[in-house]
């Protein structure tokens, strides 16, 4: 199976707005780029043949090219439209792997596991998010596929696959079931084992702003 990875990246000035109570615009921008870096590192060691990063910022393009990824300027600023734009550059027979840029614990082994459960035959493999969303999506072939990210996207993607008579494979990956959107997610990231770029940044934020972060969090202090 020939796999092309698509990594959509939100405009950096709009990213991680729910963290604005504790992180300023510069810190949120740095966190977004650190997470993108971690995702691209993982994909570069995975079996994907090509990585396409789609976004709007110069820094996003620099980060993409530093990892040998293609950078496509997002013409829409809407996630599903951006994915269709990027997928239009993928050969019809190939598979597409959508990996959001805010999965800093993604590992190459996760991509391998997803491809293994899917096999070489047409089908859809999904790593679900904890809130009913889709955190990794592998579609083979990508031709004719409609991306349906948003609320309850797991249900929508399963329905779309069945409508096309494609088998669906679900892979539960607990470390990928939450993306980094709010203060609890940031604290959770800092506490997980590992040493990714985003984790180092999250731990630095926790060290500098510990009391403020815990006060704004629903998690019990450690």
UniProtKB/Swiss-Prot annotation:
Gene3D superfamilies from the xrefs?
Answer: Spore Coat Polysaccharide Biosynthesis Protein SpsA, Chain A
GO molecular function terms noted in the UniProt entry: GTP binding; phospholactate guanylyltransferase activity
Q: Which reaction does it catalyse?
A: phosphoenolpyruvate + GTP + H(+) = enolpyruvoyl-2-diphospho-5'-guanosine + diphosphate
Query: Which InterPro entries does the protein's record reference?
Result: CofC (IPR002835), Nucleotide-diphossugar_trans (IPR029044)
Entry keyword annotation includes Disulfide bond: no
Q: Give the enzyme's EC designation.
A: 2.7.7.105
| Taxonomy, superkingdom | Bacteria
What are the BP-aspect GO terms?
F420-0 metabolic process
* Keyword Nucleotidyltransferase listed: yes
Biological pathway? Cofactor biosynthesis; coenzyme F420 biosynthesis
The record, for Pfam families, names: CofC
Residues given in the record as phosphoenolpyruvate binding sites: 134, 150, 153
Q: Which cysteines are joined by disulfide bonds?
A: none
Keywords, in A-Z order: GTP-binding, Nucleotide-binding, Nucleotidyltransferase, Transferase
Going by the record, the broad EC class of this enzyme is transferase
Family membership noted in the UniProt record? Belongs to the CofC family.
- Recite the other comments: The exact nature of the substrate is currently not known. This entry has been annotated based on its similarity to Actinobacteria.
HAMAP family cross-referenced by the UniProt entry? CofC (MF_02114)
Entry function: Guanylyltransferase that catalyzes the activation of phosphoenolpyruvate (PEP) as enolpyruvoyl-2-diphospho-5'-guanosine, via the condensation of PEP with GTP. It is involved in the biosynthesis of coenzyme F420, a hydride carrier cofactor.
Any idea what this protein is called? Phosphoenolpyruvate guanylyltransferase
Gene symbol?
fbiD
